[in-house]
Design a protein with these regions (language model features):
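Cofactor-binding catalytic cores of oxidoreductases
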Residues: 23, 56, 69, 90
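Short, surface-exposed, low-complexity cationic segments
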Residues: 30, 78-100
């Protein structure tokens, strides 16, 4: 069984030979560890091939604190290698919306397609500003509906461009949760955002690809909705939810891309704690038709010994059938 077959079988609950794994690393970690981290990745290869890419990669690794992206959003970072935050919002004033121009699509002649479906909630935040957007959603302004639809239309073009390259999956990323709740009421999410996501997910499935969705924070309330509208592989933030409860919601319904606790265990835990965390994750999410992909985000504060322990544990405990 090759890596591609292994991942597809995990997503489609068709019994892979082991838990497939993927590398998820912040540029700041690569800056800190360099070749030592690359060596770990060679020892424990990803089943996804090429890892994550960043459009602002050169800026992330530079000493410049300010960056203006192709959307006109102004980013500031405090530390090299970390994403930073958007501080300048091109549509902070709705008057600017009338003349705002969406960016041109990437030139497909560049030959490298990431398989990204983009973001929706976060893109709207960056364009309007977080507080402005929440006010818009609560008051139901006409412009915020138009903005949502324009962002979706743009993302649909990106999705179609990616599908032309025959990718296996399209990834979406929107951080919807705080530590213990959704950022907006679930009812508002269902009314305003759920139909928009469905438009994009339907396009992915029409093109024969899987839908991958990432969200940080507590999102338990909307996981059944995400599954209903077509998410095939879900990457939630484990440290914000009860894993046993999450397992009951996801088991047999959606493949889970793990998030080994990056708030405590990966950066500050012992090697044994990392191994036990991986073992627990496999027992909860890998036991039902093997719908699990192994992952843990590697930041600059994660010791190399814990990175090795995580991948070794997935290799050791993730062979199917699972040992009780």
């Amino acid at each position: 069984m090759n890596s591609r077959e292994r991942v597809i079988r995990a997503i489609e609950f068709e019994a892979p030979d082991r838990v497939p794994v993927t590398h998820s690393v912040l540029p700041a970690a690569l800056m800190r560890y360099g070749e030592k981290l690359e060596r770990v990745f060679r020892d424990y290869p990803s089943d996804f091939g090429t890892g994550y890419t960043y459009t602002q990669y050169e800026w992330l690794l530079s000493g410049r604190k300010r960056y203006v992206d192709e959307w006109g959003c102004v980013w500031f970072k405090e530390q090299k290698g970390l994403m930073g935050q958007v501080k300048g919002h091109p549509i902070a004033d709705w008057k600017a919306f009338e003349t705002y121009r969406f960016p041109t699509l990437p030139d497909k002649r560049l030959g490298y397609v990431t398989g990204s479906g983009g973001s929706l909630f976060e893109r709207m935040q960056w364009l309007r500003g977080f507080k402005n957007l929440l006010k818009d959603l609560m008051t139901g302004r006409r412009e915020v509906i138009l903005l949502r639809d324009k962002v979706v239309d743009y993302n649909l073009q990106v999705i179609r461009r990616s599908l032309e390259s025959k990718v296996d999956g399209i990834g979406f990323s929107d951080d919807w949760g705080t530590q213990d709740r959704l950022m907006i009421k679930p009812s508002l999410w269902r009314e305003f955002y759920k139909p928009a996501y469905k438009r994009m997910f339907d396009e992915v499935h029409k093109g024969g690809a899987h839908v991958h969705f990432h969200s940080d924070g507590y999102i338990m309330d909307i996981i059944p909705d995400l599954v209903e509208i077509g998410v095939d592989a879900l990457n939630p933030q484990f440290s914000c939810m009860n894993l046993e409860a999450l397992g009951k919601v996801c088991a047999g319904k959606v493949c889970v891309v793990s998030d080994i606790d990056r708030q405590r265990i990966l950066p500050f835990g012992s090697v044994e704690e990392v191994r036990e965390s991986v073992k627990r994750v496999i027992s909860i999410f890998g036991s039902y038709n093997r719908g699990l992909i192994g992952r843990g985000e590697i930041g600059p504060d994660v010791p190399l010994k814990n990175v090795k322990a995580m991948f070794q544990a997935f290799k050791e405990y993730g062979k199917y059938p699972l040992t009780p």
